[in-house]
Amino acid sequence: MDARTIALDDSHGDVLVVAVRGEHDIYTAPMLRDRLEQALGTAPTGVIVDLSAATFLDSSILGALLEARRQALEQTVGYVVCLGEEPERGVERILEITGLVPVFPVVRSLDEALEAARSAPADA
């Protein structure tokens, strides 16, 4: 069984969750882009990228996250990254060393992410 998945969860009403699980790189970046475009294409109130089960992200994944953030800003859709309560240190670190923590609203729980996606303006 391949533990690398990217799933779209629409069970939270007006906020869609793109759940990223496992190691992701240039080979799975197109799938992430597709899921993010699919989520943004429905004109939700917000999109959450759930990285709580991600174990590795390369630069192509970071590029996909940045592009989706840009699209969310253009569409005034809330965009939040959820690292989870105990994120994989490598995932958290890559966001820190690339300077992306201030670019994305980053939270630790799905509840926090849902609240932030619904209440924060997209350009925050």
Where are these regions (language model features)?
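STAS-typified acidic loop motif
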Residues: 2-34, 53
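Short, solvent-exposed coil/turn elements at secondary-structure transition points
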Residues: 23, 85, 110-112
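Amphipathic alpha-helical interaction surfaces in cytosolic regulatory modules
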Residues: 26-103
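Alpha-helix termini
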Residues: 35, 111-112, 122
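Short acidic-hydrophobic, aromatic-tinged amphipathic segments that line or gate anion-handling sites
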Residues: 103-113
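A cross-taxonomic marker for long C-terminal extensions/tails that follow the last structured domain
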Residues: 118-124
